[in-house]
């Protein structure tokens, strides 16, 4: 049994001859250069075929790889619909820059492109569109005379055929070798885009990695709607230039898509896999000549003749109840395909103001809403329903956009008031509210505002200069909060209940003074008991009223709105 333990082991003798020589049988197998790709963000090695199947998105860290213009065509454009324009337009050497012609030829051979942008007409899920796609492989997507000319011709094509325009940006900025000819393309394209806007046509930009320099400072940031792929580098000046100028290290995430969205310059960050669907939906939301489908079948709710027993304080308490439906509850139940857009294009995005486009019975409608939270975390995110200046500026931007595309506007009001804080004052809270008031009175599209909860002071009025102002039965609309009223007049905020009952803040009070146009009665005296029924009441009233308002010509609409506010006030001549 133990003999095997002590059995002598036999070894094979190996010659040391040629051990130091290279054994060709041990060489690594030859792997084609394009078989594997390395993610620059996480360092993972990815099988290229799998990467392409995944829209060139890293499956480990979700990094979006840079892709060619023609790969973009395959991903976005319906098969068989792409018709390229101006393919043979090529660069010359206006400054006789040494070596420029040779570099152009090498770039053309390497990329199979004639220039840094391809342009054409194609369909995105059936929506015919003029499309420009930049390619950073060609001179880093820099903008010279040809890029400027091809994009300008595309804009003119959009105007001529009344088609929307989509531009995918990917650029290092100006083409150094073309000097001032390059710089002037920024003005040339912007001038053409001005004509596109005057024609009332949609322009969407999709910012991809990288979008910098003169492209950022011109057509990239002029879209009616600005989308971006996640993590894209977007900025005007380069990071090194900024660091050298300010002699400081820049923060992590600086000049990314996420950074720009936080600061109010991007409407939406969209994963590449969802880009085609997102673009298609935006294009559908901007179709011309839409009509309400079921207008003739609509019946609005009858007036509830039973007296509501709640006093003003009771209604205020109900309006503030955390179970009361929020603006987003109504948006989800009333509108189809609601798409939210972000940013004021100046400073930031205020999550207290929700804005976007949705479909109301077949008609695209711009929706602006003040949103409260249901718990502490959500209330912190929504700033307890108190908008900052950037919220009002975002609202005005979207309302101006609605005017351009002839869309009616509905505003949901639910705020204790505009945010009172040092930073809000520094950023011009008063100016932001004032600009909304003066602009809303002259918007050439119908506007309906609905107070669904609290309507607090100028913070509510900033979204209420409308053709029709409605209130839910248990909503309130006031000069300021009863607590503030009691503090100012009686220096005792504990008298808020008494203040509420003398301030005339209920829907019945305000309707009796003709300060609002309609009361929407709540199911079972409480909207929170049946959100769907309440939503249906609002929806039917909106369809009916918008249909009436859209029949008015421009002058009649604006005159009626002006006169609505002109006659407000109680006074007499002293005898």
Curated annotation (Swiss-Prot):
Pathway: Lipid metabolism; malonyl-CoA biosynthesis; malonyl-CoA from acetyl-CoA: step 1/1
Cofactor needs: Zn(2+)
Stretches the record annotates as Acetyl-coenzyme A carboxylase carboxyl transferase subunit alpha: 265-571
Molecular-function annotations in GO: acetyl-CoA carboxylase activity; ATP binding; carboxyl- or carbamoyltransferase activity; zinc ion binding
Residue ranges annotated for the CoA carboxyltransferase N-terminal domain, each copy included: 35-301
Region feature (Acetyl-coenzyme A carboxylase carboxyl transferase subunit beta): 1-264
Transmembrane spans: none
Compartments it resides in: Cytoplasm
Main location: cytoplasm
Record note on quaternary structure: Acetyl-CoA carboxylase is a heterotetramer composed of biotin carboxyl carrier protein (AccB), biotin carboxylase (AccC) and two subunits of ACCase subunit beta/alpha.
Protein name: Acetyl-coenzyme A carboxylase carboxyl transferase subunits beta/alpha
Name of the gene encoding the protein in the UniProt record: accD
